[in-house]
C-alpha cells in the first residue's frame, strides 16, 4: 500500500483538476457517484479508495486519467 506522502500527492492532483474543471467537492462527488469523504478536506487522516480514484478519473469534466491522478503519469508509455 502506498504511503501517506503518495496519497497526499493523489489528493493534490485531484484537487488541482477539480479546480480546473470548476467543480466543488460536492459536485465532483455527485458526478463520480461517490460519497463525500474526509479526505476531501485535505487532512491526511484518510485517502480516496482506488475505486474512488477510478470513478473521479471517469468524470468527463476532470479531463484526466487514473494513471495521472494516482501516479502522476502523463505519458502512458511510462506504464510499461
Regions from the PLM with identified roles:
Residues 28-29, 56:
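Short alpha-helical "recognition helix" segments of helix-turn-helix
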Residues 20, 31, 59:
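Residues within the alpha-helical elements of helix-turn-helix
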Amino acid at each position: 500500500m502506498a504511503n501517506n506522502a503518495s496519497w497526499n500527492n493523489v489528493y493534490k492532483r485531484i484537487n488541482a483538476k477539480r479546480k480546473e474543471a470548476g467543480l466543488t467537492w460536492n459536485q465532483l462527488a455527485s458526478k463520480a457517484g461517490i460519497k463525500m469523504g474526509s479526505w476531501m478536506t485535505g487532512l491526511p487522516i484518510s485517502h480516496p479508495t482506488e475505486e474512488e480514484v477510478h470513478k473521479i478519473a471517469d468524470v468527463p469534466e476532470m479531463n484526466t486519467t487514473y494513471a495521472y491522478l494516482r501516479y502522476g503519469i502523463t505519458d502512458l508509455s511510462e506504464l510499461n
